[in-house]
Amino acid sequence: MRHLLSTRDLSRDEAVRILDVAEDMADVGTREIKKTPALRGRTVVNLFFEDSTRTRISFEAAAKRLSADVINFSAKGSSVSKGESLKDTAQTLQAMGADGVVVRHPSSGAPHTLAGSGWIDAGIVNAGDGTHEHPTQALLDAFTIRRRLHGSAARGKGLDGTRVVIVGDVLHSRVARSNAWLLTTLGAEVTLVAPPTLVPVGVGSWPVTVRYDLDAALRDGAPDAVMMLRIQAERMRAAFFPNPREYARIWGLDDARLALLGPDTIVMHPGPMNRGLEISAAAADSERSTVREQVANGVSVRMAVLYLLLSGDGKADR
C-alpha cells in the first residue's frame, strides 16, 4: 500500500488486512510498554491545514507507539499563513526527509493532489479533505463494529449482512462518504437517513439506501449499528433545517428511540458530539455506545495504516 486516500480505492481483501493488522496493534496497546520498534528511524509528519484535536493526537500516538519520529505541522503561524503554497510546503518536507505525511485539508482532493504531484516521495494518508473523505475514521468504525459482532473471532472477517444506519448531516460529512464505500465493500447494508436538505447531490450513485424517516428506518431496518453524525454548523451558509429543537425531535437519537433499538444494537458517533441535538446524553453514555471504544480503536487502526504504508509488511512486529 503506497497511499491511503479514499476507502473507495480499497478492495475487500485490503480492507480486511488493515483491520487484521489493527488487531495486532491493539494487542500492543495492552502491554505494560505500549511500543513496538516497527517504524524506528522513520519520520511521520502530521500536516494539518484545518483545526483538529482527536484525529491529530490519534495519529501522533499511533506513530509514536510504532517508534517513528513525529513532526506536527499546523498551518496557523506557519509559512502557509504567509502565503506558501501546498507545493512549496511539500517540497520542504521532502527536503527534510519525511517518510509519511498525514494530511488534513479544507479542500476536497488535496491529499490526492499531493500523492500524485511528484513534489514529495512519501506515503500520504488522507486525514480528512473538505467534505470528501476521512478513510481512517471509516476504518476505525468498521473495526469497532467487527469487534462488537465477532469479538476474538473477528480476524479475517468482513461485515457480511450487517445492517448499519447512518443518520444526520450527510451533505457535509466526509465520514458518511468514507463509511458508505468501506462498509459496503466489507459486505454491510448501509442506509442513510437525513433531512432532504442534507442529502448530497449524486447520492444515487452511492451503494446505499436513502431514507428520510428515522423512526421507520430504525423500525424496518433492525440495524446492528446506528451511527449519528455531527451537525456541521461551521460548514453551513444557509438554513438546512428549521431549528435545532425541530431537528432533534425528527432526526435525533433521543431516549425514546434508544429504548426501541434491538438488544444488541450499538450506537456510534465519530465525535465531537452535540449532546441534545443529534444524540441525547443517555444514548451517548449508554452501554450501547461505542464512542470511547472508537477513540481507542482509532489509535490501533492508524498504527496499522502507518505500519502497512511505511514498512510494506503485513505482519506486525510483536
Curated annotation (Swiss-Prot):
Pathway field: Pyrimidine metabolism; UMP biosynthesis via de novo pathway; (S)-dihydroorotate from bicarbonate: step 2/3
Binding-site positions, carbamoyl phosphate: 54-55, 104, 134, 137, 271-272
GO cellular component: cytosol
Signal peptide: none
A GO MF label: amino acid binding
Coiled-coil regions listed: none
Binding annotation for L-aspartate: 82, 174, 230
GO annotation terms (biological process): 'de novo' pyrimidine nucleobase biosynthetic process; 'de novo' UMP biosynthetic process; amino acid metabolic process
Source species, domain of life: Bacteria
EC number: 2.1.3.2
Function: Catalyzes the condensation of carbamoyl phosphate and aspartate to form carbamoyl aspartate and inorganic phosphate, the committed step in the de novo pyrimidine nucleotide biosynthesis pathway.
PANTHER family named among the record's database cross-references: ASPARTATE CARBAMOYLTRANSFERASE, ORNITHINE CARBAMOYLTRANSFERASE, MITOCHONDRIAL
HAMAP family: Asp_carb_tr (MF_00001)
Recorded family membership: Belongs to the aspartate/ornithine carbamoyltransferase superfamily. ATCase family.
Subunit organization: Heterododecamer (2C3:3R2) of six catalytic PyrB chains organized as two trimers (C3), and six regulatory PyrI chains organized as three dimers (R2).
Name of the protein this chain belongs to: Aspartate carbamoyltransferase catalytic subunit
Natural source organism: Clavibacter sepedonicus (Clavibacter michiganensis subsp. sepedonicus)
